[in-house]
Amino acid sequence: MTSDDRIKLEPSWKNALRDEFEQPYMAQLREFLRQEHAAGKEIYPPGPLIFNALNSTPLDNVKVVILGQDPYHGPNQAHGLCFSVQPGVPTPPSLVNIYKELKRDLNIDIPNHGCLQSWADQGVLLLNTTLTVERANAASHAGKGWQHFTDRIIQVVSEHQPHLVFLLWGAHAQSKQKLVDATKHLVLTSVHPSPLSAYKGFLGNGHFGRANKYLEQNGIAPIDWRLPAL
C-alpha cells in the first residue's frame, strides 16, 4: 500500500476506487500500517490478501453484499473475506450459525470447513468494513481510515447496477444501510449470527432463499450457497 501503482487490485475496482488512493486518509492509513509493521506487530490478513474480497469479486460480478466488521485476529484465520476462514481452520461460531440457517432455509448440508471462497467467486462480496487487524487484538485497526474506503466501496456497488442484495447482520452492518439506495436494491437486515444474538432473529431469517428469489425475479442467476468439500 505504498503507492497506487503497486497495489494489487482487480482492474474494475482499481478504476472505480482510484480517487480514494489519493485521499489524505489513505496516506494516514498507509503510515499507520507502516508503523505497526516497523514495531514488529503481526497484522492479519497477510498483505496479499487484504483486498481479497475485491480481487475475488469484480465489480461487474457483484450480486450479493455481506458486510462484516473486522478480520479474525487468530493465526491462519483471516484471508480477506468476511466470516470466512482459511481451509484447515475450525469454523468460527458466527459462521456455524450461518451454516445452521442455510440448513434450515435451503436444506444445505453443513460443510466440513469455513472457507467461503466459492461464494466470492460467484458474486458474493464478502466485505469487512475494516480490512486489517493486529494479532489477538480485536478492532485494533477500527477508526484508522479503512471505514472511509469501505464506505466508498458500498456506495460504488449501490450506484453501479440495480437489483443487488445487501445482507446486513447486526447493528454495525446496519449502520451502513444509509449508503445503499434501497429503491434499487433488496436490503435484508437481522441480528448478528454471533452466538450472543443468533437465536434472537438470525436463525429463521430466510435471507439466503429470499436473496436468490429476488435475483431470479430480476433475471440474475442465483447463488449456489452450497460449499464444496475441502
From Swiss-Prot:
Organism: Pseudomonas syringae pv. syringae (strain B728a)
Gene Ontology CC terms, in alphabetical order: cytoplasm
Catalytic activities: Hydrolyzes single-stranded DNA or mismatched double-stranded DNA and polynucleotides, releasing free uracil
EC number: 3.2.2.27
Subcellular localization, as worded in the UniProt entry: Cytoplasm
Keyword Ribosomal protein: no
Gene3D superfamilies: Uracil-DNA glycosylase-like domain
Gene Ontology MF term list: uracil DNA N-glycosylase activity
Family, per entry: Belongs to the uracil-DNA glycosylase (UDG) superfamily. UNG family.
Protein's UniProt name: Uracil-DNA glycosylase
SMART domains assigned: UDG, UreE_C
The organism's taxonomic lineage, starting at the top: Bacteria, Pseudomonadati, Pseudomonadota, Gammaproteobacteria, Pseudomonadales
GO terms (BP aspect): base-excision repair, AP site formation via deaminated base removal
UniProt entry keywords in alphabetical sequence: Cytoplasm, DNA damage, DNA repair, Hydrolase
Active site (catalytic residues): D70 (proton acceptor)
Coiled-coil spans in chain: none
